């Protein structure tokens, strides 16, 4: 079955943004507002953070399990960064789309662009920009969960990700949460098939 045949039954919405931009919050609020989206849960080898649940926030896999799935072509996309693997499980995605679900993904820039390359116009790429690099640095420091070196790496990665914003279908600066959610929800509602 081709990607086009599967996707005639559901749509893909992909959120990307530098870490600390608020994409998880925006995604959650947009999902609550629209009610017609199902969150695609990514797999990862990173350690579970406080409050996270396996199968809800991520599918937490051992490195060995993840590498086995890579060898079996079990991912739509996967990435290795900051010492951990992240990926989108092919079987879970296909099952949800076949069931007619519209899936929302939280992916890095490379993963988003890979997904768009595979699924074309059936995928809508949404990029959230921070108000400024200074504000992004402040938000990341407020998390107090990373070393100075990791923070520096995240900020460098953010600059790279921001350079790809023009490759996305819809770009919005997250400087006001309410306005951002309104704009993103409106664009997604226009993209989804009408009943």
Curated annotation (Swiss-Prot):
Its main location: cytoplasm. The keyword Disulfide bond does not apply. GO terms for cellular component: cytosol. ATP binds at residues 17-24. NCBIfam families: guanyl_kin. It catalyses: GMP + ATP = GDP + ADP. Its EC number is 2.7.4.8. It is an enzyme of class 2 (transferase). It is found in: Cytoplasm. SUPFAM superfamilies: P-loop containing nucleoside triphosphate hydrolases. Belongs to the guanylate kinase family. This is Guanylate kinase. CDD domains: GMPK. InterPro entries: GK/Ca_channel_bsu, Guanylate_kin-like_dom, Guanylate_kinase, Guanylate_kinase_CS, P-loop_NTPase. Keywords: ATP-binding, Cytoplasm, Kinase, Nucleotide-binding, Transferase. Essential for recycling GMP and indirectly, cGMP. One of its GO terms (molecular function) is guanylate kinase activity. The lineage of its organism: Bacteria, Pseudomonadati, Chlorobiota, Chlorobiia, Chlorobiales. Residues 10-189 form the Guanylate kinase-like domain.
């Amino acid at each position: 079955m081709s990607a086009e045949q599967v996707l005639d039954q559901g749509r893909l919405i992909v959120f990307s943004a530098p870490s600390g931009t608020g994409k998880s919050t925006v995604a959650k609020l947009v999902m609550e507002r629209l009610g017609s989206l199902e969150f695609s849960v990514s797999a990862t080898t990173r350690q579970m953070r406080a409050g996270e649940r396996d199968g809800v926030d991520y599918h937490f896999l051992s490195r060995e399990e993840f590498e086995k799935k890579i060898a079996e072509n079990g991912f739509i996309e996967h990435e290795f960064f900051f010492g951990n693997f992240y990926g989108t499980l092919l079987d879970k995605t296909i099952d949800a789309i076949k069931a007619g679900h519209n899936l929302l993904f939280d992916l890095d820039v490379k993963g988003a662009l890979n997904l768009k390359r595979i699924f074309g116009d059936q995928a809508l790429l949404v990029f959230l920009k921070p108000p400024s690099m200074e504000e992004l640095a402040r938000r990341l420091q407020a998390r107090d969960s990373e070393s100075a070196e990791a923070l520096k790496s995240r900020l460098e990665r953010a600059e790279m990700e921001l350079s790809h914003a023009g490759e996305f279908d819809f770009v919005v600066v997250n400087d006001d949460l309410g306005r951002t959610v309104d704009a993103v929800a409106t664009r997604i509602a226009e993209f989804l098939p009408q009943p």
